[in-house]
Amino acid sequence: MKKIWIGMLAAAVLLLMVPKVSLADAAVGDVIVTLGADLSESDKQKVLDEMNVPDNATTVTVTNKEEHEYLGKYISNAQIGSRAISSSSITIAKKGSGLNVETHNISGITDEMYLNALMTAGVKDAKVYVTAPFEVSGTAALTGLIKAYEVSSDEAISEDVKQVANQELVTTSELGDKIGNENAAALIAKIKEEFAKNGVPDNKADIEKQVDDAASDLNVTLTDSQKNQLVSLFNKMKNADIDWGQVSDQLDKAKDKITKFIESDEGKNFIQKVIDFFVSIWNAIVSIFK
């Protein structure tokens, strides 16, 4: 059975003790790395080598006590666990480049889930990497990544936005267990796109309609409980100080990256290889009955 919530909870608060960095000090390529306090020396070196951390990177440590302090509002103490082991890094990218997320040994949170929640929090133009020395769920990485971005860019993110972004990640992960990770991430992104493009709904009833419409468009079936969970999340988003213009911009950049990849020689070759693979399987099946 998949371990949900355990392990990557460290990364949620990994950067809470990062020394203040001024905007004048931040530059393209600057890196902040977070390490769990309970990593063994060998595991610590393993993740540092994996992330290819430069000598001038800011590195901080987080304790399990800090994990409980910042995550206890959303999940139980048992789910948070007793060890801080996860790691992450955020690298400042050039203006207008958008967000890029990559993960390793993360079983419960997809790249798209992190991308969605980071957009909500106002994080932009950064390369994000989340990892652990062994497989963990990854739920806790967001808070640390937000803090890393905040201190390196000198852009304060309001507490209500941080809270709703963390709630979004938890909600998407839980929903992903029921309807599939891709469906959950796509559904959240579609509803947010409606908020960003057409304006924040005036009331709860309008939010319910947007949830229903998005689920219908994506051919996703939701239970009443799942629908209520989403309505609750987006009702909080409605009241949070979210920069929806920036969310829209980051969503557009993410779409542009996908489109450019598909249209590139690399993307076309990849798609052709996928097609060839399934054709070969089909031909093998057909040959059995000849």
Swiss-Prot record:
Record has Membrane as a keyword: yes
GO cellular component: membrane raft; plasma membrane
Compartment(s): Cell membrane; Membrane raft
Induction of the gene: Transcribed under partial control of SigM ECF sigma factor.
Keywords: Cell membrane, Membrane
Keyword Cell membrane: yes
Predominant cellular place of this UniProt entry's protein: membrane
Xref: Pfam families: DUF1002
Superkingdom: Bacteria
InterPro entries xrefs: DUF1002
UniProt protein name: Uncharacterized protein YpuA
Gene: ypuA
